[in-house]
């Protein structure tokens, strides 16, 4: 009836899966009993000449070529939800001779997670999320996001291992359902991130953690008044730290940032991302970009959103927790960290426990190893504090796969360039305030050129622990003192290896040793070309990218960016008019 409302695209976990989809002897395993998910898959397979869903198929014991994983249900609101089992899986368990040779492909259906731009705020509210579904919600998903559906085909189940098991039919059904749910949950988490719908639950779990309870008990020494006081203080710290990520807000950010990137930047170039996509479903990612500008937060989150990876929880300095700005950043996933808390043991315990809970729940995390913005383009030494805390949080969770992802972010024009020039000229660095942050927006009206995000070689935390094992937890402090700088150096090295030499960098270097107040255009072009040839001949690393524009094009780009006066249209370029 509503077929005309549904338009889907798809992604397959492997090339083998893609080929098998045209094999008529496959069985689909849907992640839910949703009728609109079923309808979307039915329409998509028919339109793309893939194996269609069949309600009657005599070749299979289940008499059709699909089954659906059933969600827990309850008849009355006060009842505990009861786990429901797939009847079709029970039949497959009874017919093991058939099932061990069957091709079973699990299927996920996502509504509104495709990277097309939304043109209606209602679409933003009824995209895929962790929230429960209902008839009304499904109807709105169909109406507002039916043209924006993504279908994900997993690799086939390992039926030979499953159905050769000596277990009873009942246990086999339970085992297969657990396996399927784990796959669906992992894939859903990779696309949406962990369930963030209840901030209070996270806060409560942190406050009830053993580390905080033990600290309060040791400090209060049984004094109820002191215990209450410390617990209130811990609660205050947790609420101060935690993010408040909101899907509707994120979708609205998407619309605003799409306008910003498309209207102000010539290009947002993404390099070496595919390796990160490959490891994302099985690995918790800790994004570690260099820090040039406040735009860094937006650029990386925007990219991950459009690449269909979970948005990270972002470590932000408490100096950004300003009125109006702070709540908006929290909605986008930022959590706040004080610059120094070495003398506040309770805050340290709370922050550590918060970080540990994020890692346990499978959140990806983003932090800036330099600690502050380096607008000069030169990387600063890594700050050991947050790196050390992440290492501590990971100890005891060896079964989790965690990787640091170094990222080099480069701009042709940095928005905060003027404030940096003032600091170089002797002005003191100001504390962040609303006026300074909003003053950056005045440059939003201007052309900002190109931006580059290049992903460096991931660093496996598991491999690092094998290289530097901690044999005795009593020596944890010495171990951290030894390993933290090693990890920090590797992150910064991989960022540096992935740098992009922009047109602005080439232009700046070319005029740096000019001995007069002007330079001929011909001389400037030849200097730029010489620098490019030297950089290519003595490339810093295989991942280093050098601007491909010619010398003439780079000079034109500097005019567009506003660095050269419009008066410089003759054969000589004045170096006193540089802006």
Regions found by a protein language model. Name each.
Residues 1-579:
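Membrane-interfacial terminal anchoring regions of lipid-handling membrane enzymes
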């Amino acid at each position: 009836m509503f077929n005309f409302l549904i338009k889907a695209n798809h992604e397959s976990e492997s090339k083998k899966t893609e080929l098998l989809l045209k094999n008529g002897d496959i069985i689909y395993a849907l992640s839910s009993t949703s009728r609109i998910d079923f309808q979307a898959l039915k329409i998509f397979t028919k339109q793309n000449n893939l194996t269609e869903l069949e309600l009657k198929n005599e070749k299979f014991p289940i008499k059709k070529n699909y089954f659906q994983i059933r969600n827990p249900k309850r008849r009355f609101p006060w009842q505990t939800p009861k786990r429901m089992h797939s009847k079709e899986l029970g039949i497959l368990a009874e017919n093991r001779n058939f099932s061990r040779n069957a091709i079973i492909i699990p299927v996920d259906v996502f509504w509104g997670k495709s990277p097309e731009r939304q043109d209606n705020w209602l679409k933003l509210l009824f995209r895929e999320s962790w929230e429960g579904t209902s008839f009304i919600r499904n109807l709105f998903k169909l109406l507002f996001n039916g043209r924006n559906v993504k279908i994900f085909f997993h690799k086939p189940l390992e039926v030979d291992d499953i159905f050769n098991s000596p277990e009873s039919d009942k246990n086999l059904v339970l085992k297969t359902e657990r396996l399927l749910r784990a796959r669906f949950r992992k894939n859903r988490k990779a696309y949406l991130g962990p369930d963030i719908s209840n901030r209070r639950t996270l806060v409560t779990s942190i406050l009830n953690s053993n580390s905080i309870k033990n600290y309060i008990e040791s400090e209060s020494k049984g004094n109820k008044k002191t215990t209450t006081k410390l617990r209130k203080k811990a609660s205050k710290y947790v609420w101060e730290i935690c993010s408040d990520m909101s899907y509707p807000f994120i979708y609205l950010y998407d619309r605003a940032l799409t306008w910003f990137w498309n209207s102000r930047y010539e290009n947002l170039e993404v390099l070496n991302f595919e390796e990160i996509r490959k490891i994302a479903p099985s690995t918790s990612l800790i994004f570690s970009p260099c820090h040039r500008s406040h735009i860094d937060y937006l650029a990386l989150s925007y990219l991950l959103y459009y690449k269909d990876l979970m948005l990270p929880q972002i470590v932000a300095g408490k100096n950004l927790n300003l009125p109006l700005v702070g709540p908006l950043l929290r909605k986008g996933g930022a959590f706040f960290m004080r610059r120094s808390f070495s003398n506040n043991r309770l805050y340290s315990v709370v922050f550590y426990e918060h970080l540990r809970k994020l890692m346990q729940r499978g959140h990806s995390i983003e932090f800036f190893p330099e600690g502050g913005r380096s607008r000069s383009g030169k990387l600063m030494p890594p700050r050991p504090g947050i790196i050390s805390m992440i290492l501590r949080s990971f100890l005891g969770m060896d079964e989790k796969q965690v990787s640091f992802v170094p990222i080099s972010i480069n701009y042709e024009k940095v928005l905060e360039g003027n404030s940096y020039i003032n600091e170089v000229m002797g002005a003191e660095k100001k504390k962040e305030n609303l006026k300074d942050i909003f003053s950056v927006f005045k440059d939003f009206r201007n052309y900002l050129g190109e931006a580059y995000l290049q992903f460096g070689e991931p660093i496996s935390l598991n491999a690092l622990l094998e290289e530097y094992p901690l044999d005795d937890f009593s020596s944890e402090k010495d171990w951290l003192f030894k390993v933290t700088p090693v990890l920090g150096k590797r992150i910064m090295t991989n960022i540096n290896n992935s740098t992009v030499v922009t047109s602005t960098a080439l232009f700046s270097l070319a005029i740096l040793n000019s001995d007069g107040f002007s330079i001929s255009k011909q001389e400037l072009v030849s200097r730029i070309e010489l620098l490019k040839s030297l950089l290519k001949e003595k490339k810093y690393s295989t991942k280093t990218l050098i601007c491909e524009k010619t010398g003439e094009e780079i000079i034109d780009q500097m005019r567009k960016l506003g660095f050269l006066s419009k008066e410089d249209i003759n054969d000589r370029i004045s170096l006193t008019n540089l802006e």
